[in-house]
A protein has these predicted regions:
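A conserved beta-strand-loop-helix scaffold within acyl/acetyltransferase catalytic domains
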Residues: 57-66, 131
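Conserved acetyl-CoA-binding loop-helix of GNAT-fold acetyltransferases
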Residues: 83-97, 118, 122
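Conserved beta-hairpin
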Residues: 41-60
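Glycine-rich phosphate/pyrophosphate-binding loop shared by adenosine-nucleotide-utilizing enzymes
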Residues: 51-56, 67-70, 139
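Conserved acetyl-CoA binding element of GNAT-fold acetyltransferases
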Residues: 67-81, 86-87, 142
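C-terminal "cap" of GNAT-fold acetyltransferases
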Residues: 133-172
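Short amphipathic alpha-helix that is part of the acyltransferase structural core
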Residues: 1-29
């Protein structure tokens, strides 16, 4: 919580514009607590650069009733860009767990945050649509997602998650 709160208090302008517009009352400490406390167990991290916390990122449950539906999040200080290679390697290192435990991983991002869009797309997410007036001030956001394709079971005709019906699911 300490790292995430520090990063939130020293957040770069792009991330502040993207995140603060979602809050009725902006609070950097509350963001740090929310980021860590709502994370999927073991799925919240911070990256330090030059002796200070510089980036926070992770996955939270996007739905209270669907443990396989996750929301990705990341924010950082002005040194965030220097952390992107390490963030990317770290996330890719968890790919097998993400593919196993998560049916849908989504991320929302401010419509004009084009640097974030390029990184998200490079990681393989697909842009699904525009969330009009998603921000409290009328800001539009894009929603991106990675979605696990389920194999259909022969006996029930219902989708089965990877490992539940003996078939391997893939991501798109």
């Amino acid at each position: 919580v300490r790292d995430a709160s520090y990063i939130a208090a020293n957040m770069r302008a792009e991330d502040f514009r993207e995140i603060a517009c979602l809050w009725k009352h902006w609070d950097t400490r509350a963001l740090g607590v929310c980021a860590v406390e709502t994370a999927v167990p073991g799925m919240a991290w911070s990256v330090w650069y030059d002796g200070q916390p510089a980036a926070a990122f992770g996955f939270s449950r996007a739905s209270a009733f669907d443990p396989e539906h996750w929301q990705a999040w990341a924010f950082g200080t002005d040194r965030f860009r220097r952390c992107v290679p390490q963030l990317t390697r770290h996330v890719l290192g968890f790919r097998s767990r993400i593919e196993r435990d998560c049916r849908r991983l989504q991320v929302i991002t401010l419509k004009d945050h084009d640097i974030a869009h390029r990184w998200i797309e490079a990681l393989g997410a697909r842009r699904e649509g525009l969330l009009r007036s998603y921000g409290r001030g009328g800001e539009d956001f894009w929603i991106y997602a990675w979605v696990r394709r389920h194999a259909v079971t022969e006996t029930t005709g219902c989708p089965g998650a990877s490992g539940q019906d003996g078939r391997k699911a893939s991501w798109e």
